[in-house]
Amino acid sequence: MADATEKAEHDRIFKKFDANGDGKISAAELEEALKTLGSVTADDVKRMMAEIDTDGDGNISYQEFTDFAGANRGLMKDVAKIF
């Protein structure tokens, strides 16, 4: 379970990734966000989408994002430093 600080970080990062503010992260939005972290290929984006988009609807919901973030705390700390 994420504490309040961790939840606030997840909220902040999710909003940065969700460029159009529709409450979900599309593959295009994920690609743009990942470009901030360095070079990213279309295959990288596909792999990340496949891993995070657990319901397979083509978008990353807030719940899917927080589930991934909770399982990958070290990675999310690194992402939080950049965003």
From Swiss-Prot:
CDD domains (UniProt xref): EFh
Residues given in the record as Ca(2+) 1 binding sites: 18, 20, 22, 24, 29
Keywords, comma-separated and alphabetical: Calcium, Metal-binding, Repeat
GO molecular function ontology, one term from the record: calcium ion binding
Keyword DNA damage tagged: no
GO cellular component: cytoplasm
Pfam families: EF-hand_7
Superkingdom of the source species: Eukaryota
InterPro entries attached to this UniProt entry: EF-hand-dom_pair (IPR011992), EF_Hand_1_Ca_BS (IPR018247), EF_hand_dom (IPR002048), EF_hand_pair_protein_CML-like (IPR039647)
PANTHER family named among the record's database cross-references: EF-HAND CALCIUM-BINDING DOMAIN CONTAINING PROTEIN
Cited function: Potential calcium sensor.
Annotated protein name in UniProt: Probable calcium-binding protein CML29
Organism: Arabidopsis thaliana
Lineage start: Eukaryota, Viridiplantae, Streptophyta, Embryophyta, Tracheophyta
Originating gene: CML29
